From Swiss-Prot:
Gene Ontology CC entries for this record: membrane
Location(s), subcellular: Membrane
Protein name (record): Dammarenediol 12-hydroxylase
Key words of the record: Heme, Iron, Isoprene biosynthesis, Membrane, Metal-binding, Monooxygenase, Oxidoreductase, Transmembrane, Transmembrane helix
Organism: Panax ginseng (Korean ginseng)
General function of this protein: Component of the dammarane-type triterpene saponins (e.g. ginsenosides or panaxosides) biosynthetic pathway.
Catalytic reactions of this protein: dammarenediol-II + reduced [NADPH--hemoprotein reductase] + O2 = (20S)-protopanaxadiol + oxidized [NADPH--hemoprotein reductase] + H2O + H(+); (20S)-20-O-(beta-D-glucosyl)-3-hydroxydammarene + reduced [NADPH--hemoprotein reductase] + O2 = (20S)-ginsenoside C-K + oxidized [NADPH--hemoprotein reductase] + H2O + H(+)
Residues the record lists as binding heme: 434
Applied biotechnology: Transgenic tobacco plants coexpressing PgDDS and PgPPDS1/CYP716A47 accumulate dammarene sapogenin (protopanaxadiol, PPD).
Tissues in which the UniProt entry reports expression: Accumulates ubiquitously in all organs of plants. Mostly expressed in leaves and flowers, and, to a lower extent, in roots and stems.
Hydrolase recorded as keyword: no
Induction: Up-regulated by methyl jasmonate (MeJA). Induced by A.niger mycelium-derived elicitor, thus improving ginsenosides production in adventitious roots culture. Slightly induced by Tween 80. Influenced in roots by soil water potential, and in leaves by temperature, rain and relative humidity.
Keyword Heme: yes
Protein encoded by which gene: CYP716A47
Bilayer topology: Single-pass membrane protein
């Protein structure tokens, strides 16, 4: 046995240089040199190590909560408009500032298209072998039909009822709660009810416990071997897919038997009953993937945002008092036990300013990715076809040029006309604006209304450490002590 181990490691040491050389030459072939017939050079920058590129440095900045530093250093060294790097095994251009954001958001399907890291492709394989980007383009319109303003209006009352029930079972009987844990339960419950009309508590708990395991695999090294974050995430997605496919099969039966006639059409029924642009219907596995993706996206986005909203309201009593005043006025305008409606949410202007300021300081994700579908030039530099581009929200969100004293929590930034165009991009922009933005707004505001009109609270760990992996979260989940108004 010992001899075999020695032989194994000896061979590994001999082969390692060859593997590194192979990786290097394979990678450099993917980075086109300046075209002979093109006068534009490639963007300035560096590609770092073979395959790894500058990914480790980038992830280090992300996990430290200072992803803007990754951009700032390279803007100063290479170009304030665009620079070259290598992330996630891909040659990548970073287009900087609001000008870069506007360019990428306005050239969707003309020069660029959405791109997902290989980790996402491995976790969510499509039934016909097409990429997630192509599949999502086909189904986006179907999802937007229900997730845009007109589609979400009818869910306000239902969502308020779910929140009030949640408050009764999880808040009113407690003196202390862990915000992160209770918000997780709330967001998963809400997505299950709105997207799939699931109200079975045990099933909601199973889905919620699985969804949180996906997050770690999104930016993981795409190596699927036992023990890796990617392997755990893939196993989780398979389990979730089986669970959601069972819900889909039952819904098909219910639709055939007309059992859903009295129910408002949720996203699941809409995806089952509506054909794509090409006249084809989605497979059960593809519908499951899209529903899981939406649930995971909502889980990641909303958990952090709502948790940090409660954190800042505890830290800034004057902000809390203004939110309370706004929400009490809305509550007093309604009959006892009357549920919120769309017009009530439109009145929550200051509350939404608070949520937006949280989204500015703590964006709900690391940013979005695009892929060049043709050669094009930007700021005098060639972006070759196949290159990837990365939009990093902190590049503008924490830039004092666009947000003076960017580390200061100040909801008044969003009063009046608000920030300059393309400087505030937590949900993307242009035709690729996140389809769930209205859903997210409803979930956040309904939560704020119900909690603020019932409680004040104080943090039990005043200077609790914030971890980022890759989404910011409190090390201990933000435990708070509740003080009911009555």
């Amino acid at each position: 046995m010992a001899a075999a181990m020695v032989l194994f490691f000896s061979l590994s040491l001999l082969l390692l240089p060859l593997l590194l050389l192979f990786a290097y030459f394979s990678y450099t072939k993917r980075i086109p040199q300046k075209e002979n017939d093109s006068k534009a050079p490639l963007p300035p920058g560096q590609t770092g190590w073979p395959l790894i590129g500058e990914t480790l440095n980038y992830l280090s900045c992300v996990k430290s909560g200072v992803s803007e530093n990754f951009v700032k250093y390279r803007k100063e060294k290479y170009s304030p408009k665009v620079f070259r790097t290598s992330l996630l095994g891909e040659p990548m251009a970073i287009l900087c500032g609001p000008e870069g954001n506007k360019f990428l958001y306005s050239t969707e399907k003309k020069l660029v298209q959405v791109w997902f890291p290989s980790s996402v492709e491995k976790m969510f394989p499509r039934s016909h072998g097409e990429s997630n980007a192509d599949n999502f383009s086909k189904v986006r319109g179907k999802m937007m039909f229900l997730l845009k303003v007109d589609g979400m209006k009818k869910y306000v009352g239902l969502m308020d009822r779910v929140m009030k029930q949640f408050l009764e079972t999880d808040w009113n009987r407690q003196q202390q709660i862990n915000v992160h844990n209770t918000v997780k339960k709330y967001t998963v419950t809400m997505s299950c009810r709105v997207f799939m009309s699931i109200d079975d508590e045990e099933q909601v708990t199973r889905l919620g416990s699985s969804i949180q395991n996906i997050e770690a695999g999104l930016l993981a090294v795409p190596i699927n071997i036992p023990g890796t974050a990617m392997n755990r995430a893939i196993k989780t997605v398979k389990l979730l897919t089986r669970e959601v496919e069972a819900v889909i099969k039952q819904r098909k039966v219910d639709l055939l038997e007309n059992k859903q006639a009295s129910q408002p059409q949720d996203l699941l029924s809409h995806l089952l009953l509506t054909a794509n642009q090409d006249g084809q219907f989605l497979s059960e596995s593809d519908i499951a993937s899209h529903l899981i993706g939406l649930m995971q996206g909502g889980y990641t986005t909303l958990n952090g945002t709502i948790t940090f909203v409660l954190n800042y309201l505890a830290e800034f009593p004057d902000v809390y008092n203004q939110v309370l005043k706004e929400q009490v006025e809305i509550a007093n305008s309604k009959h006892p036990k009357e549920l919120l409606n769309w017009e009530d949410l439109r009145k929550m202007k200051y509350s939404w300013n608070v949520a937006q300021e949280v989204l500015r300081i703590i964006p709900p994700g690391v940013g979005t990715f695009r892929e060049a579908i043709t050669d094009f030039t930007y700021a005098g530099y060639l972006i070759p076809k196949g290159w990837k581009m990365h939009l990093i929200p902190h590049d503008t969100h924490k830039n004092p040029t666009y947000f003076p004293s960017p580390e200061k929590f100040d909801p008044t930034r969003f009063e009046g006309n608000g920030p300059a165009p393309y400087t505030f991009t937590p949900f993307g922009g242009g035709p690729r604006m996140c389809p769930g933005i209205e859903y997210a707004r409803l979930v956040i505001l309904i939560f704020m209304h119900n909690v603020v009109t019932n409680f004040r609270w104080e943090k039990l760990i005043p200077n609790e450490k914030i971890l980022t992996d890759p989404i910011p979260r409190f090390a201990h989940g933000l435990p708070i002590h509740l003080h009911p108004h009555n």
